[in-house]
Amino acid sequence: MNVFEPRLSSWLENAGDDDDVVLSSRIRLARNLKDEQFPIYDQKEEVVDNIAEVFDDNFTLIKMNQISKLQKALLVEKHLISPYMMNKSEYGAVLLNEEENVSIMLNEEDHLRIQCMTPGLRLFDALEAALQIDGYVEEKLTYAFDKQFGYLTSCVTNIGTGMRASVMVHLPGLVTTKRIKSVIEAIRSLGFVVRGIYGEGSMPASSIFQVSNQVTLGKTETEIVEDLTQVMEQIIMQERVARTTLKQKFHIALEDRVFRSYGLLMNCRIISMQEASDAISDIRLGVELGFFEHISRQKMNELVLFSQPAFLRKEAGRDMDELEEKVIRAKVIREILGDK
């Protein structure tokens, strides 16, 4: 297993339900060990070793103090660790399976953060996988649990189930038709949170949004997933309607925009992250509307991931200034799009 190589995790490589709109689903369970101080206050490396002993050879342990800054950044870009773990977790670690659809962060804000990712809208599959791992760990270690409040966590907003269910969606139709603001307001009024592609602290960009639950206390895991799934089904429907409207009423203008973006990425020699992200979003929309039969969703995911700064530094084999990064990004994008 070499997680630092430029390859897609299984949840970005494989097909999933409603994946014309939904990029991925994720379930994250926050857990702490009984009689151990929460890692946000006091990190202990032996806690990592004790937890890691529970898992078999199907998981690879990666300790943060044994890898480079570049390798940490690669893990963040692949959504396998959080920006918090990259920047603040001295004695943190992550357990990964071969498919990279299970990521168990150790000594992040909590002792364990069990993440299971699936392609498309498959929250229940992710929940089943996460609860299976959680049950296995709970048979061998004692969690910090209160009969009244549920699982105890470093952040009070996670107390209860300790669960965050989230869905990453691409909503260019709603953005272009200027309906996204009202949709986000409706989502928030139902008790859900809308963030950017890297979750907490990140802003939505290039029509990619992450929608997650806010309430963890007073509802079961199944109820939370059912509620979020229902919300996402409504969002998916509205996004498809918006795309159909754009194609029917503004076909030439939309086609021009999409093919201009394609021409830009096929021929550019210097390109910024933001410009590339916006163009990739346009092309992804074009793929879903049938403008590009030779471009797969998998290739679109490659464009998104491998044009990120850390992957570009790995491609170049060195640190780069801003101009060099833009040049390498343009080269990588041309190579991916040109590989039919």
Swiss-Prot record:
GO terms for biological process: phosphocreatine biosynthetic process. Catalyzes the specific phosphorylation of arginine residues in proteins. Its EC number is 2.7.14.1. Coiled coil: none annotated. InterPro entries: Arg_Kinase (IPR023660), ATP-guanido_PTrfase (IPR000749), ATP-guanido_PTrfase_cat (IPR022414), Gln_synth/guanido_kin_cat_dom (IPR014746). SUPFAM superfamilies: Glutamine synthetase/guanido kinase. NCBIfam families: PRK01059.1-2 (NF002192), PRK01059.1-4 (NF002194). This is Protein-arginine kinase. It is an enzyme of class 2 (transferase). Keywords: ATP-binding, Kinase, Nucleotide-binding, Transferase. One of its GO terms (molecular function) is ATP binding. It comes from the Bacteria. Belongs to the ATP:guanido phosphotransferase family. GO terms for cellular component: extracellular space. Residues 21-242 form the Phosphagen kinase C-terminal domain. The keyword Nuclease does not apply. It catalyses: L-arginyl-[protein] + ATP = N(omega)-phospho-L-arginyl-[protein] + ADP + H(+). ATP binds at residues 24-28, 79, 113, 164-168, 195-200.
